């Protein structure tokens, strides 16, 4: 049996495993530093066992913060759950320092309960459940000031110790960029024997400052050999509710997501407008996907493409 890793452990799969100062005195140092021994995190087997009844895993990524990735995750989940009532969906919020899903899903103040089979995720609807570190905080204003290894440990717990049950799709709301959290979740979910073990959707806005970082996110997925279902362009335009005039709040100076997707050879799933009603509903934790409007019309096509990609 291996001992628990030290606080600043670089990770057993890291090239620095067993070689940095944090490794000094660790009982596992000789194991990690031996190039002849396979460096595979023992937690990976626990994750695989815990998620054996989860058919598909979908990372929701964004290169830039503020593009509405968490809002898009919520909208996708709610629309999918409404459109496929016989399927079960889960949401895992792994934005450890900025958990948004409890508010967006209308679950603020809910508690996570421990059972014999692990943590029980919070039920949102009959076929939707949610897990977030936001449920474990004493107050919504509590700051989480953790280094990478502690975040990674929390992600491993969420993946291996939550009783997700039978899910058709688990959506993972990630922080922006390509940080420790992304490397950690990919290492746990990726199965080399099954290339389709985890997929990704990337969220952007039309302006070049967001697209620059999305290109990096696409390259990250390609290097990690994660199939990209497609890109969603959020806040693509605003239609006045009074006169019907459309305005580009974030002008696409370089062609927007469509041009970038053509350049990077990835699918464009669709575009979502900037809608004040959606923002208001998300702040209140309300489901607005049953109301027919430009956003839900766009979601219909996007969600159909997502589900088709798994068949």
Swiss-Prot record:
It is found in: Cytoplasm. GO terms for molecular function: 4 iron, 4 sulfur cluster binding; ATP binding; ATP-dependent FeS chaperone activity; iron-sulfur cluster binding; metal ion binding. Pfam families: ParA. [4Fe-4S] cluster 1 binds at residues 9, 23, 26, 32. Gene3D superfamilies: P-loop containing nucleotide triphosphate hydrolases. Its cofactor is [4Fe-4S] cluster. Coiled coil: none annotated. ATP binds at residues 63-70. [4Fe-4S] cluster 2 binds at residues 240, 243. Keywords: 4Fe-4S, ATP-binding, Cytoplasm, Iron, Iron-sulfur, Metal-binding, Nucleotide-binding. Binds 4 [4Fe-4S] clusters per heterotetramer. Contains two stable clusters in the N-termini of Nubp1 and two labile, bridging clusters between subunits of the Nubp1-Nubp2 heterotetramer. GO terms for biological process: iron-sulfur cluster assembly. It comes from the Eukaryota. One of its GO terms (cellular component) is cytosol. Heterotetramer of 2 Nubp1 and 2 Nubp2 chains. Belongs to the Mrp/NBP35 ATP-binding proteins family. NUBP1/NBP35 subfamily. Component of the cytosolic iron-sulfur (Fe/S) protein assembly (CIA) machinery. Required for maturation of extramitochondrial Fe-S proteins. The Nubp1-Nubp2 heterotetramer forms a Fe-S scaffold complex, mediating the de novo assembly of an Fe-S cluster and its transfer to target apoproteins. This is Cytosolic Fe-S cluster assembly factor Nubp1 homolog. It comes from Drosophila pseudoobscura pseudoobscura (Fruit fly). The gene is Nubp1.
């Amino acid at each position: 049996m291996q001992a628990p890793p030290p606080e600043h452990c670089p990770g057993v799969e890291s090239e620095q495993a067993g070689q940095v100062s944090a490794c000094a005195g660790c009982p596992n140092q000789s194991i990690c530093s031996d190039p002849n021994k396979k460096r595979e995190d023992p937690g990976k087997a626990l994750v695989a066992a815990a998620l054996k009844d989860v058919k598909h895993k979908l990372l929701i990524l964004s290169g830039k913060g503020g593009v509405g990735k968490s809002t898009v995750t919520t909208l996708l989940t709610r629309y999918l759950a409404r459109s496929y009532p016989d399927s079960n969906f889960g949401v895992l919020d792994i934005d450890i320092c900025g958990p948004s899903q409890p508010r967006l899903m209308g679950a603020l103040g809910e508690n996570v309960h421990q059972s014999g089979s692990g943590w029980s995720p919070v039920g949102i609807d009959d076929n939707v459940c949610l897990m977030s570190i936001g449920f474990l905080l004493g107050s919504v204003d509590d700051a989480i000031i953790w280094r990478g290894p502690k975040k990674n440990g929390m992600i491993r717990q969420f993946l291996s110790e939550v009783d997700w049950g039978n899910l058709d799709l688990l959506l993972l709301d990630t922080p922006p960029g390509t940080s420790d959290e992304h490397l950690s979740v990919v290492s746990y979910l990726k199965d080399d024997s099954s290339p389709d073990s985890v997929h990704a959707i990337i969220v952007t806005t039309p302006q070049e400052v967001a697209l620059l970082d999305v290109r990096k996110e696409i390259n990250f997925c390609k290097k990690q050999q994660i199939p990209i279902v497609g890109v969603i362009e959020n806040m693509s335009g605003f239609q006045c509710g009074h006169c019907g005039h459309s305005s580009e709040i974030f002008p696409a100076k370089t062609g927007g997501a469509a041009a970038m997707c053509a350049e990077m050879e990835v699918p464009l799933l669709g575009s979502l407008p900037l809608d004040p009603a959606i923002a208001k509903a998300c702040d209140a934790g309300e489901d607005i996907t049953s109301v027919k409007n430009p956003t839900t019309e766009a979601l219909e096509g996007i969600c159909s493409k997502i589900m088709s990609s798994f068949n």
